[in-house]
Amino acid sequence: MQITDEQAKAMTSAGLNLIAQALTIYDSDLKLVVSNAPFQQMFNLPDRLVTPGAPFEDTIHHLATRGEYGPVEDVDSFVTERTDQARAFIPHYMERTRANGRTISVEGSPLPQGGWVSVYTDI
């Protein structure tokens, strides 16, 4: 059976949107490559932040200004710090309590070709 690239993309998107966990993939320049619908829903993100090419730092800035990371005195410094951490491309796992009181786990792993894949789970 042969499928077109467009069909493969549609099938992959359907599969990613079916899972309950939120997922993002950023390239080596920290630009969004792909995210699933649960990512946008979990964080109530505007479309501009889940469109391929959206900068990682814009998403962090948006979340920080909404209190997603707790009280942040200097949002710009916080965004710079988080972006620098992401650029280190070191695997990580953390659990944090969100502004809505729910706890999520965040697991990130660098990709061999550069970039990140992150999975967010409501625990």
Where are these regions (language model features)?
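Catalytic micro-motifs at enzyme active sites that drive phosphoryl/nucleotidyl and oxygen chemistry
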Residues: 12, 106-107
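PAS-family sensory domains
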Residues: 1-2, 20-87, 110-123
